Amino acid sequence: MLRIGLTGGMGAGKSTVARILADLGAVIVDSDVIAREVVAPGTEGLAALVAAFGSDILAADGSLDRPALAAKAFADDAARAKLNSITHPLVGKRTAELIGAAPAEAIVVQDIPLLVENGLAPLMNLVLVVDVPAETRIRRLVEFRGVAEADARARIAAQATDEQRRAVADVLLDNSGPEGAVEQVVRELWERRLVPFERNLRAATPAAPGTSELRVDAERQAQAQRLVARLAVAGGAAAARIEHVGPTAVPDLPARDLLELQIVVADAAAATGLRDALGAAGFPAMSGEGSGALRAAAWHGSADPGRPAVVAVRVEGTPEQRFASALGERLRGDAALREEYLDVARKAEAEAAGSVGAAAGAAFDAVLHPWLAEVAERLLGTV
């Protein structure tokens, strides 16, 4: 099962994207719908709200009078906390039920307006953000929903900023164009990334490596941090720390499109214990341990074809852990070492040219890895 988080600011067109994904076969779990469902007439949720805030929060027909509840529940922090203590567990329980009922091969899209505000992005295998400039969203709310402009501005100001949403976005869906323009983008995303991602997850197979072409990509640092956040949730207390390592950890250094991450653990047993959790987070286990300075207690690879990555789980204090932690810093500060790397990496790029997927990765590694082993011998005495 692939779990996708879908979010966007008010007026961005998130519901439109959700409908397209549903048409393509996704299972949609809409948090707004669930929030209404758990406080419908006759539910334990509504009964708990009445007990907490009084019967005057009910409409004449026995349903929840939302403005009346808001007047009481948002009066102060204590009242808001009381409201959340009632509704959040019920929403969480119902969400878990719906996800649990989905088929094993499902692509589950959780439509969550406050995904960023509630810190839920690392719980998802992938996050889609529907992106529209705030002024455009305000205009849409005023023209198409009849919201007063002052109210629209106030409500948007109370949500996460566009920059905060973009920071968690694995995929940014620009919906600022004409009606219907985003549909083709979503359909291509479904076919090229989401379906293969789910297939890889179900088969416990990492995605094929990315291109071996050397290039600088300003997005890699943010991409790595999103993966680090997911690995931190999956690793829990067993992960002492998680690092972006290797050439892609150096922002201005040309590198192939393969993020390298390292999870540092206390011992080999901890590495073994992470296997299932990392797999569920989108990082299936890989065979082998490697050798020498490139050895790891366990290797995992991203199942996402849109963001190739490898994850080495290494024991704290081992030579291979110390080398991986130090290499990026040395590449940043040692001009001579950078030139060495670039010379070898260009040779590896040439060797991999003409090959694709795993074959290209193997050809690249066959040139790069001996140099890394030699550098490790030089550096380990100093780190």
From Swiss-Prot:
Enzyme Commission code(s) on record: 2.7.1.24
One Pfam family this sequence matches: CoaE
Domain DPCK: 3-201
UniProt entry keywords in alphabetical sequence: ATP-binding, Coenzyme A biosynthesis, Cytoplasm, Kinase, Nucleotide-binding, Transferase
Reactions catalysed according to its record: 3'-dephospho-CoA + ATP = ADP + CoA + H(+)
Record's comment describing the protein's domains: The C-terminal UPF0157 domain is involved in the proper folding of the full length enzyme.
Similarity annotation: In the N-terminal section; belongs to the CoaE family. In the C-terminal section; belongs to the UPF0157 (GrpB) family.
Name under which the protein is recorded: Dephospho-CoA kinase
Organism of derivation: Nocardia farcinica (strain IFM 10152)
Taxonomic lineage from the root: Bacteria, Bacillati, Actinomycetota, Actinomycetes, Mycobacteriales
Name of the gene: coaE
